Design a protein with these regions (language model features):
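Structural/interface elements that position substrates and couple domains in central-metabolism enzymes
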Residues: 1-244
């Protein structure tokens, strides 16, 4: 069946178990690579050096794997490691590295929210209003399944911070049904104290700094660039930028 539609070739696994295990470890490997980046970003933040600068330098080595820090959601990468660890434990083996990676990635949304709160308190002495750009689980898709942006939202709200969310690709009714939150059209957003670029849709990146700065209540607002996509060289001088 697959051979009739797949032109890149087919690898015939010896059993369905092997095929399923292969798919699970593909996603688990990616999850662990991102967890490594997220942990490195914690280390480099403590050392007061920019993670993006370190990764750019490391990428000059031909065999360095190009992963970046960020949220890990969706119906594959953030889920499959738990299938694997569950079956491993049923078979009598307790995984350590895989679960450690999951803990790091599961904490990333709350970490971003706390960095936002710290920035707001440092600048204004209060929480204020935060605009979150993006609700889908990754860039340039409408899929909201297991989006970890909800972790940022929940943590901010738990500290009394008001949040408004915009995403041109996500279906507002589906978001409300799945997460119990509303979306706001980008042109209807109120000027905010901070902007979190949580999902780097091409539409946001095309708008660049003028778009982001236009969403702030003051020219000297706080911006959190989760995937390090905004060009630092063209950042308006008054804006405070946080990157993982």
């Amino acid at each position: 069946v697959y051979g009739s539609v797949v032109t890149a070739g087919i690898h015939r696994a010896p059993s369905i178990k092997v095929a399923e295990a292969a798919k699970v470890i593909e996603n688990t490997q990616r999850d662990l690579n991102i967890a490594f980046m997220n942990e490195l970003s914690l280390i480099f933040q403590a050392l007061e050096i920019d993670t993006g600068d370190v990764l750019a330098a490391a990428a000059t080595k031909w065999n360095f794997l190009p992963f970046t820090p960020g949220l890990v959601g969706g119906h594959c990468i953030g889920v499959d490691p738990y299938y694997l660890t569950y079956r491993a434990e049923k078979a009598g083996y307790h995984p350590e590295v895989i679960l450690a990676g999951r803990r790091i990635n599961d904490e990333m949304g709350r970490r971003i929210a706390r960095e936002c709160i710290r920035g707001l308190l440092r600048r204004k002495g209060r929480g204020g209003l935060v605009t979150i750009l993006g609700m889908t689980f990754k860039e340039n898709v409408p899929d909201i399944r297991n989006s970890r942006v909800i972790d940022i939202i929940g943590e901010l709200q738990s500290f009394g911070v008001e949040v408004q969310i915009a995403d041109p690709l996500a279906d507002a009714a589906a978001v409300h049904e799945e997460y119990g939150i509303g979306l706001t059209a980008i042109e209807a957003l109120r000027p905010a104290d901070a902007v979190v670029l949580a999902v780097s849709h091409d539409q946001y990146l095309a708008g660049g700094w003028p778009l982001v700065q236009g969403l702030l209540s003051e020219e000297s607002g706080l911006v959190l660039d989760v995937k390090m996509k905004l060009d630092r060289a063209s950042k308006p001088a008054a804006i405070e930028l946080w990157r993982p």
